[in-house]
Amino acid sequence: MMTEPRDTSSVRHRPRLFKSFFQGSFACSTACRGEGKRVDLTVSSGHDTLLDKDYARLAAEGLLTARDGARWYLIEEKPGEYDWSTFMPMLHAAENQGIEMIWELAHFGWPAHLDIWQPRFVDSFAAFARAMACLMRDEGYTAPFFTPMNQISFWSWAGAEVAMFNPGVTGRGGELKQQLVRASVAAMRAIREELPAARFVLTDPLVHVASSDNSPAAQEEARQQHNAQYEVWDMLSGRLQPGLGGDATLLDIIGLNYYPDNQWLANGETLAPDNPAWRPLSGLLEEVWHRYQRPILIAETGAEGEARAPWLNSVVEQAGLAMDNGIEIEGISVYPAVDYPAWADDRRAPGGLFGLPDANGSRTVNEPYVLAIRSHQIKFKNAG
């Protein structure tokens, strides 16, 4: 028996927060690897010398909102002294190309003169954030978008549980998480003192952890691992460990980073989409929405090689289902916008819309990926 399609026009969320729903994110990590080598992806991707061209590439595809990084380690090489010479070309290039930017203030890196474990780190980051806000205000901005600390949960795990990169220790992930939350809270308060209308995109991975068997112990372990993804947002909002300074006014836009390997069993085995334990993205988005009731940006998503377009298609489809149910999905940002040598091992990561530059500064275009984005843009425009 055929049924009439459900009319979702009255409940479907209509995104209005950003200049464009489809967006691009530039790889801008400045982490130090275990051997002490700093990996600046803005440099290794060639983006630092191709700012106007790279932003123009996004604009030409209708990606008018983007994420990029203000590299703190370069801006504050000397304590309390800010050299904006690496940032101002980025700001002006974005303006020239009509790109609305979400500026990351710390993406796994910090100035060499600071000890991340000390109280001074928090104070210094807040001072840097304040200086950034003052600069933006002087440049005529009243309500810019910032991400104070990118992916605190992942940074805490990678940097202080498994020593993948700086601070390069093990067994201190919880301690680092609290320190980064303190710094984020202090930075957001400092920014809002200078720019009361500033907005914050608070990014972390969106994951699902399933039980490895049906025993009560395994199910409880999976539940705890799954719910751990919410700790940072709970801390920033003051729900968890309010002594860190968080409160509900700081929990602004939830930024979700979602990749093909973001679902796994509690024993560490990655889930494939055909596994019965796999959860549709729309359900995960609904879970976040009901927990926080905040606007959601899928702040990073992507796959490598030929999987790029099919992965995006699935993410857009699932986001659309969530929006049909009134969930406030405000955008989807593809990552990376341009290819880069992977920060973990220097291999090329062929996941971008555009490839690594040649000697003339030209980048190849991944046609299936770009065509998929264009198709979805048309569909979203027609949907109103």
Predicted features and spans:
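Juxtamembrane transmembrane-helix termini
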Residues: 69-71
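Non-catalytic scaffold segments within catalytic domains of secreted glycoside hydrolases
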Residues: 2-50, 55, 59-61, 73-384
